[in-house]
Every structure is written in C-alpha cells, then in structure tokens.
C-alpha cells in the first residue's frame, strides 16, 4: 500500500504532517490518482492548494488546485473519471474519500472524514485513511464553520510519497 503525506499550514503557521495509507488493493485507479497528485509527477497536483471547505463534525475538503474554491481540479486521467467501487464504507473518522458532483465525476477533490458518514456510502469512493496526524485533522476542523468557510487559510505546503 502506498503511503503519502501533506505538510499543512494555517495562515502561514506550520500545523504539521498528515500521513495517509492508500487502498491500492481495493481501488487501484483512485489510489494512483491521489498518489500521483501528491507527488506532482504529472506536472500538477496538491502542493500549494488549500482546504477550501471545512465543516466541523463532518469533513475537510480540498484538492481544487486549479480554481482553489471547489469548482476545479482534474485527475491524472483527464478531467473526470468513473467511480471505481464502493467496497469501503465511511464508517469512522480519518477516511480519505473522493468529492464529486454526482456519479462518475471524480477529479482531484477529496475529503477527510472527522466522524462516521454512512449517508455517503455508495456515493463517494473511499480510497485511503489517515495513519498519522489525526490531531492535525482535528486542528484543521477547528478552523471550519457550518457553511464550510474557514477562519484561516489552510494550505498544503508540501505533499509527496513516503
């Protein structure tokens, strides 16, 4: 299984590292997209992008590295790709899942759950989990709001593969 990371800041202050294990064995295409966007090896990716939507007791959303507001992003396969499968469930905090605009519209946007989210099962593809830095996830969560607007600018300063 691939291991990737984000080094995250809030308003320029370093928060720390979030490490993820990707489910290459269950959703290889989805995991490979995220891995390659973490390394930036295709010439684009997550480095320098933001968490544009953070809702406490729900999730942290990021991955729009083209428009930085939730309307953009792209996958390594082109703009969008199909839902691979829904084997993994949104059954706990710290899960990595694809954000989308309906069936088969995966790009680069993702979210990290902060609570179990069973209503998302069968609609969003879970492709990894936080293995280290859940405290950083909780810190980012504290900068969110009910509307999703963040009180601080949350930036992925560095990302890559370990």
UniProtKB/Swiss-Prot annotation:
GO terms for cellular component: cytoplasm; fungal biofilm matrix; mitochondrial intermembrane space; Set3 complex; yeast-form cell wall. PANTHER family: PEPTIDYL-PROLYL CIS-TRANS ISOMERASE, PEPTIDYL-PROLYL CIS-TRANS ISOMERASE D-RELATED. Its EC number is 5.2.1.8. One of its GO terms (molecular function) is cyclosporin A binding. PPIases accelerate the folding of proteins. It catalyzes the cis-trans isomerization of proline imidic peptide bonds in oligopeptides. Residues 5-161 form the PPIase cyclophilin-type domain. It is found in: Cytoplasm. This is Peptidyl-prolyl cis-trans isomerase. PROSITE patterns: CSA_PPIASE_1, CSA_PPIASE_2. It catalyses: [protein]-peptidylproline (omega=180) = [protein]-peptidylproline (omega=0). The gene is CYP1.
